[in-house]
Amino acid sequence: VISQNWLHGVFLDVKSFFVPGTGFDTGRELVNRVVSDTQKTTISFEAGQAGADRADPSVNWMATKGDATVAYDPAFTPSLPEFNPATGKVNDVAVDPGIAIGHELIHATHIMAGQISGLSPVNYTGVDGTPHRAKFDEEARTVGVGGSPRADDITENDLRRQNGIDLRNNYSDYAVP
């Protein structure tokens, strides 16, 4: 579990984290991928931000392994569309800070592996069954709603399932044509 502390830093919640089979296997695997990779991910505090990028802009992040940078502010919790299965409705809900950093660490694993799935728009179906269009294939893939996934992907929605949080319905920047 990734948690926010009162100093606006990030720490790993030790409770249940190192004990396999406690329901936190997806988060544990994500952190393991980040810390055990030969490539480096640097996380820095940037007020009002959550984002991931390649450390060296000259690296082709779609085909070449490279180091990643993550900008993160635990107090930055924008409202995101979550699908509530009990009501069948999508509601904008402030994102859990652990899910926010998890989303960016997923991007970091893609960058470190040289497997960013693309920066082209992609059409997909949201969790609620409605059509959406993401500005970038990589974002739909990272959320777990579409794009060009790989068999071993960890997604934001996997982390949400693990923590009992409603799934993110979509990552939309554009209207569907």
Give the positions of each predicted feature.
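Active-site recognition of the HExxH zinc-binding catalytic motif
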Residues: 96-112
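Auxiliary, metal-adjacent structural segments of Zn-dependent hydrolase domains
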Residues: 1-77
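Active-site or metal-binding loop neighborhoods of secreted/extracellular toxin and effector enzymes
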Residues: 112-177
